[in-house]
């Protein structure tokens, strides 16, 4: 998952009561797709309380920062933002006005009271498992409390979140995220997720289908199922049998209006036969798979507690491509994990060559407090990490550009997602996730049209519509 920073657009929380004219919220999102989804659900919850969204903190009564804790710089971004908000809050106070500041997400879960110590201007700290309590927490803040809500709730948060209004969902577009699973039980030694998101929890089939049907009714054509370890999802199916993610995908594909399905992020250990069968038989399931491996060295994979070997990963990729030859792969890589030798790194480079990724994310290892990796010895020098990352990214970039170039001349169906920058231009999404720009097009957002790729842009494809 990427670490792009986004914000909730004003359309995502509309006026629902007379109080809406006096209370505005600005939600800023750091981190992964799950955080984007969580921010949308928090916006829905606040809309039910009479808040309207604004695209700037300048006129907001509530600023909510939904944070990421995967890498150190994400925490640094939070405290930098809080420093700027402190000045804004002080200026408001000088004018006799109030600004409520809340911190949500994984940094909130990891640091809790420490956030209030480092940033006393913060009024509210709320974790990813308790944000359904946000309205109550804000009421306590208005009563003069400093609130920290980071316990793991006994109740099911999804049962306590209001469903977004149809008009609100419609304004979010024709592609949507849907969280089906949270948490992780893998305990990779570099990762904070088990400590910030908790143990693996799967939502029920009933909940998932109901939310998917609401999204489809609002015009959503493409669903991306989310989870920290999404292919670990399991639950009792409508036929009384135990279902895995493969069976769930087949069920969602039956919902009228849903034309495309994706899922992220996966673990190689949980790619079972039913999920591979879904890739073989389900045309709505797009031929793009994010399957992180982190390293190509068995020794480093063991130190990371990844629970698989490099050749097992490669054999899995072969199985998937045997049933879906047009499958494109993306992945995650960490360089400079403690003890990584030159040979370990070369093993990673070879695995990348063997797989030939369409896209990948790569990072230098940075120890996260509280993880087993932080206590490992034999740390790799920063200069060595830098050199290895540069080499790896050069190889991955070459593969990405080659993949884009391989699209030239191909014909494909594209889901139109939004107008382009120029008049008559539309931007769509290819089956392989790349944005596609189509000129002189009269079709509407939500239409799926047949195009031919004629050239490439920077991380995009240029297409002509076919009759």
Swiss-Prot record:
Coiled coil: none
Annotated positions binding [4Fe-4S] cluster 1: 32, 68, 106
Chief site of localization: cytoplasm
Annotated spans, Disordered: 1-20
Protein family: Belongs to the methylthiotransferase family. MiaB subfamily.
Task of the protein: Catalyzes the methylthiolation of N6-(dimethylallyl)adenosine (i(6)A), leading to the formation of 2-methylthio-N6-(dimethylallyl)adenosine (ms(2)i(6)A) at position 37 in tRNAs that read codons beginning with uridine.
Name of the protein: tRNA-2-methylthio-N(6)-dimethylallyladenosine synthase
Lineage: Bacteria, Pseudomonadati, Pseudomonadota, Alphaproteobacteria, Hyphomicrobiales
